[in-house]
């Protein structure tokens, strides 16, 4: 398996833009002000990706295990991350088969999570922490309003259908992993980026911390920005939702002059903006891949037949 490579002008300016776009992003700053534990998950995910790019697969799997230990959803990053580790692995005198490489890293992740869970059991003295941490993500007992799409739907849901739709929502979230990994198997780093954006929209309890992580990864693909078609519309929608979201929340929760539809409507707009951005950047990367494979078609219009 080989990575899809395209010459891109990665200068010191772009390197500066990449790290500054994450560190000085308003969403990142707001996350730090809120002091949530999600920053630990973000750190673990970035460390896992960094080590995967460097070819340190074992360290990458340890970091992914820690991220999955803190919250479940990072474990869905395993397929593209293992492909990235395999593509970037250091050459050895005894080449390792792909199956052996995958099984070894699966064992590393499983062993790490097993050790972390037993460490938590040793500290707390019981397994009750499982339902208080992972059970919250899987069963969605807390329907506190947030920027996600789950809470309002399950407020209106009849209890008899709750378990069914919990399975449907989790199946929907995890269904992107296989398709994107297979279709973009030569660009696993982009698969990781697009999955982080999907998680920021469709996970049970998303926050602006997830959004800041996705935005921090986007500048890695600055060379496909000219191929995007609707950046103004997407930016306007996100800015609109960012400014009105807190106002609608205040009107509903504190002022009492609105209802749940006010805030949920703006969360739909928020999710729409990011969904359009995901679709646009995905099209741009696929167009870039097509132009790399067919240089004679570069700059020509695509028509669907």
Labelled PLM ranges:
Residues 157-158:
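Membrane interfacial helix-start motif at the N-side
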Residues 146-154, 248-252:
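Membrane-proximal N-terminal segments immediately preceding the first transmembrane helix
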Residues 117-151:
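Extracytoplasmic catalytic-loop and juxtamembrane helix elements of membrane-embedded
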Residues 135-140, 162-165, 199-202:
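Active-site rim elements
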Residues 1-128, 166-305:
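Multi-pass membrane glycosyltransferase architecture that uses lipid-linked
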